């Protein structure tokens, strides 16, 4: 089995509902995402996949869908205020935890036909969540 990893960085804000710690307040993170792609064999170029293809599609989607956006649970009471300020918001069915965001990125990569096997979502330099399909 061959495996390659593409690393992507972006910034986002969020807060967690029904949470007692500091993350119940609006705050931001500098995220790092590691996307593992695997194959039993290599293509005619000797690659699992071209890193540039992964960058164009996945970095492009992350830049447009998540980067410098406020990621919030769709029931968050702060949404109307942020909308009135024309802040960029992405609403999710669940709390925007590292676990949920890892799964979201995994699912998008899979939907684009990439042979993704694992996504690691680093919320801080010392804390990450992993989602495997």
Each language-model region and where it sits:
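Charge-rich, low-complexity N-terminal segments
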Residues: 1-133
């Amino acid at each position: 089995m061959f495996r390659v990893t593409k690393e992507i960085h972006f910034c986002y804000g969020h807060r967690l509902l029904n949470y007692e710690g500091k993350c119940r307040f609006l705050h931001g993170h500098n995220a790092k995402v590691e996307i593992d792609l695997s194959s039993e064999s290599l293509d005619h170029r000797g690659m699992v996949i071209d890193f540039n293809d992964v960058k164009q599609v996945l970095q492009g989607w992350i830049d447009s869908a998540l980067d410098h956006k406020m990621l919030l649970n769709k029931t968050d009471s702060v949404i109307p205020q942020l909308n009135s300020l024309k802040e960029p918001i992405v609403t999710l069915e669940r709390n925007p935890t590292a676990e949920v965001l890892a799964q979201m990125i995994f699912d998008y990569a899979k939907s684009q036909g990439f042979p993704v096997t694992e996504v690691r979502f680093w919320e801080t330099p010392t804390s990450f969540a992993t989602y495997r399909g």
